[in-house]
Amino acid sequence: MATHSSFTATTPLFLIVLLSLSSVSVLGASHHHATAPAPSVDCSTLILNMADCLSFVSSGGTVAKPEGTCCSGLKTVLKADSQCLCEAFKSSASLGVTLNITKASTLPAACKLHAPSIATCGLSVAPSTAPGLAPGVAAAGPETAGFLAPNPSSGNDGSSLIPTSFTTVLSAVLFVLFFSSA
């Protein structure tokens, strides 16, 4: 239980950072070359539906199956735009979250949902990672990776600076709301 409570205690802060950086990465997507097509919806709000998945996909997590509203949140994300799952994985390193790639890639199967392969996300994953493993099947060891966000192009015109300021203010408001209700 101590592991679950430590994830619960960090969830509000994680969500705020995730919202901030996801908004910036989605708004700045036109400046980057990506393998996966750009999502057609605002992923930052959709990803919040997957907050309970953090304990399952985080490196060092001991949760054997998705908890709480993880699967229903994942279903919501996949129904709206499956590319938002890629956005969540891509932004994980910039949020300070190290993913267990093996478990993250089995999340849809663990929730009995169909999702595009993690390979379609255009992520730099070690070749030894086994995204096709069935839930409950472990590789030689837990594989982890922090995905690096792409470097901004040299032609960045700074157009994402205004949305970043708005996102920062929105994040601060959410931060206060989360901690004042706790």
From Swiss-Prot:
<dbReference type="GO" id="GO:0006869">
    <property type="term" value="P:lipid transport"/>
</dbReference>
<dbReference type="GO" id="GO:0009536">
    <property type="term" value="C:plastid"/>
</dbReference>
<dbReference type="InterPro" id="IPR000528">
    <property type="entry name" value="Plant_nsLTP"/>
</dbReference>
<comment type="similarity">
    <text>Belongs to the plant LTP family.</text>
</comment>
<dbReference type="InterPro" id="IPR043325">
    <property type="entry name" value="LTSS"/>
</dbReference>
<dbReference type="GO" id="GO:0008289">
    <property type="term" value="F:lipid binding"/>
</dbReference>
<comment type="function">
    <text>Probable lipid transfer protein. Proteoglycan-like factor that exhibits xylogen activity consisting in mediating local and inductive cell-cell interactions required for xylem differentiation.</text>
</comment>
<feature type="lipid moiety-binding region" description="GPI-anchor amidated aspartate">
    <location>
        <position position="157"/>
    </location>
</feature>
<keyword id="KW-0449">Lipoprotein</keyword>
<dbReference type="Pfam" id="PF14368">
    <property type="entry name" value="LTP_2"/>
</dbReference>
<protein>
    <recommendedName>
        <fullName>Non-specific lipid transfer protein GPI-anchored 31</fullName>
    </recommendedName>
</protein>
<keyword id="KW-0336">GPI-anchor</keyword>
<keyword id="KW-1003">Cell membrane</keyword>
<feature type="signal peptide">
    <location>
        <begin position="1"/>
        <end position="28"/>
    </location>
</feature>
<keyword id="KW-1015">Disulfide bond</keyword>
<keyword id="KW-0732">Signal</keyword>
<feature type="glycosylation site" description="N-linked (GlcNAc...) asparagine">
    <location>
        <position position="100"/>
    </location>
</feature>
<keyword id="KW-0325">Glycoprotein</keyword>
<dbReference type="InterPro" id="IPR016140">
    <property type="entry name" value="Bifunc_inhib/LTP/seed_store"/>
</dbReference>
<feature type="propeptide" description="Removed in mature form">
    <location>
        <begin position="158"/>
        <end position="182"/>
    </location>
</feature>
<feature type="disulfide bond">
    <location>
        <begin position="84"/>
        <end position="121"/>
    </location>
</feature>
<dbReference type="GO" id="GO:0010089">
    <property type="term" value="P:xylem development"/>
</dbReference>
<keyword id="KW-0472">Membrane</keyword>
<dbReference type="GO" id="GO:0098552">
    <property type="term" value="C:side of membrane"/>
</dbReference>
<dbReference type="InterPro" id="IPR036312">
    <property type="entry name" value="Bifun_inhib/LTP/seed_sf"/>
</dbReference>
<feature type="disulfide bond">
    <location>
        <begin position="71"/>
        <end position="111"/>
    </location>
</feature>
<dbReference type="GO" id="GO:0005886">
    <property type="term" value="C:plasma membrane"/>
</dbReference>
<feature type="disulfide bond">
    <location>
        <begin position="43"/>
        <end position="86"/>
    </location>
</feature>
<feature type="disulfide bond">
    <location>
        <begin position="53"/>
        <end position="70"/>
    </location>
</feature>
